[in-house]
Structure formats: C-alpha cells, structure tokens
Curated annotation (Swiss-Prot):
Keyword Lyase annotated: yes
Matches recorded under CDD domains: IGPS
NCBIfam families (UniProt xref): PRK00278.2-4
Native source species: Syntrophobacter fumaroxidans (strain DSM 10017 / MPOB)
Family affiliation: Belongs to the TrpC family.
UniProt name for this protein: Indole-3-glycerol phosphate synthase
Chemical reaction(s) catalysed: 1-(2-carboxyphenylamino)-1-deoxy-D-ribulose 5-phosphate + H(+) = (1S,2R)-1-C-(indol-3-yl)glycerol 3-phosphate + CO2 + H2O
Record EC number: 4.1.1.48
UniProt-recorded Gene Ontology molecular function terms: indole-3-glycerol-phosphate synthase activity; phosphoribosylanthranilate isomerase activity
Listed pathway(s): Amino-acid biosynthesis; L-tryptophan biosynthesis; L-tryptophan from chorismate: step 4/5
C-alpha cells in the first residue's frame, strides 16, 4: 500500500471515530432500516444501455493530484445534466479532506435525479455503510486495497442486508480474486495505480478475463476518449466510471456525447 493511501485511510479512521462520538452506529443502523427505497446500480449496469454502453458520471470537486478542480460545483445541477445526457448512474465524492467532497453533495444529487447514486469514499468501517444508507446512497464503493478481507466480507453482507449495492474496486489479479471470494458482483477495475497515480486502461482489459460468471465489470479512471471505450468494449466491458474529464469540461454534455459517440440513439 502506498504511503499516500495509508495517510488517507488513517485520516478516514480518525474521522469516523470522531463522527461516532456525535452520532452512534446504533442510531444510524436504526435509521438505515427506514431509509428511502433504493435504486439498483447492479440492475442499471447488468446489460448495455440503449446507447450500447453505460456511463457512471461523477460529481467531483477536486483530487489530491489536481487540487480543487471545480470549487463552485452544483451537485444537483451536474447530476441533472448527466441524467439528461443518458448517464446510467451518478457517482458522488463525499471525502472532504482529500477530494473536497461534501455529504450534502450526495443528498442534493440523489434528490435531483431518478437514476442510482453511488457514494464514493474510503470505507474503513461498517459505520460508513449505515451512514451511506441514511445519506441516501443507492450503492457504496469498497476498495479491496483499503480494508481487510474480513471487513470486506462483513461490509458486503451488511450492504445486502440493508439493500445497498456495492461496487468493489480492484487493481490487480490478487485483489480481484479477493473480491470474488468475498462474493462481490459489481467489480470496479481501477486503471489508476494508487501507488503511482498513473493510469493505463490495459489494467481493465487484463482483469476482465479473470472475472467469474455473473460478475459485472466497470472500468474506472483514465477514460477520456471514444477510442479507449472502443478498446474496452472489444474486451467485453460496457460500463465506465467517468469523473475528471466531466467536471473540468466547460460543457460536460459535449464530453458525454463524444464518449457515447456512434452508440447514441
């Protein structure tokens, strides 16, 4: 694990412990049982959409490598624009310390659209699973590199219990095997190496060959043009998580139109 990722995870653990002192896990668990009806991310991605592909479009204010990219971002407005362009789902960064995200962004985005909304954060505790449900998320991101196999399995079971989908992120064959053993269905193949922050879509092309029947592949990070999508489609991948190129573009609609390309209806 890279030193930088370790720094993020240690800070996240401190954040969670601090929040627990304000709102107990028991309270969140009770609230999660009566949270709003979920929209299924798994169902939205199980087959190619009418454009031939599915895009999870991301609401993202910043990143450690780029700093603040869109300080005035209106999460609800971006989510509506994404949905109107044919996005299958919306991903919302809620990490404040490193990605400048806000929990309020997820709530605003969820209220603005009818498609599933994924909470993208660094999950290090079951507390955050209940928190995500209460926040209004339809799905959460679980990063294999960030948690133990035991916690991964526990979080997946908990997600199933309270009706959340889980996108389980991997970057290597070993991580994919761990995700599969834990029972993951939605597999997010991160083309970005969290140790070096370089991206290479060949990561997804190599990993999809190891996936088990019934699993659903999502290619994440570094996807900026239709040619890359064509290569990934040839490998059998039709789901793509797109973030930075959308929130930094003057017209996200134009970027999405380019990515959908000839697949537009």
């Amino acid at each position: 694990m890279s030193d930088f990722l370790s720094t993020i995870l240690e800070e996240k653990k401190r954040e969670v412990e601090q929040r627990k002192r304000t709102i107990s896990e028991e309270f969140l668990e009770e609230r999660s049982a009566s949270a709003m009806e979920r929209r299924s991310l798994c169902r939205a991605l199980a087959t190619p959409g009418r454009r031939g592909i599915n895009i999870i479009a991301e609401v993202k204010r910043g990143s450690p490598s780029r700093g603040v990219m869109n300080p005035g971002l209106d999460a609800a407005q971006f989510a509506r624009r994404y949905e109107s362009c044919g996005a299958a789902a919306v991903s919302v960064l809620t990490d404040a310390g490193f990605f400048h995200g806000k929990a309020g962004d997820l709530r605003s985005a969820r209220a603005a659209v009818k498609i599933p909304v994924l909470r993208k954060d660094f999950i290090v505790s079951r507390y955050q699973i209940f928190e995500s449900a209460v926040m209004g998320a339809d799905a959460v991101l679980l990063i294999v590199r960030a948690i133990s196999p035991e916690l991964l399995g526990e979080c997946l079971r908990l997600c199933r219990r309270i009706g959340l989908d889980a996108l389980v992120e991997v970057h290597s064959a070993e991580e994919l095997d761990a995700a599969s053993e834990a029972g993951a269905v939605l597999i997010g193949m991160n083309n970005r190496d969290l140790s070096t922050f370089t991206t290479d879509i060949r990561t997804s092309i190599q990993l999809v060959r190891r996936m088990r029947p019934g699993q659903v592949a999502v290619s994440e990070s570094g996807i900026r043009c239709r040619e890359q999508i064509d290569r990934l489609l040839d490998a059998g991948i039709w789901n793509f998580l797109i973030g930075e190129s959308l929130v930094t573009a003057p017209e996200p609609e134009a970027v999405l139109a380019h990515l959908f390309g000839a697949y537009a209806a």
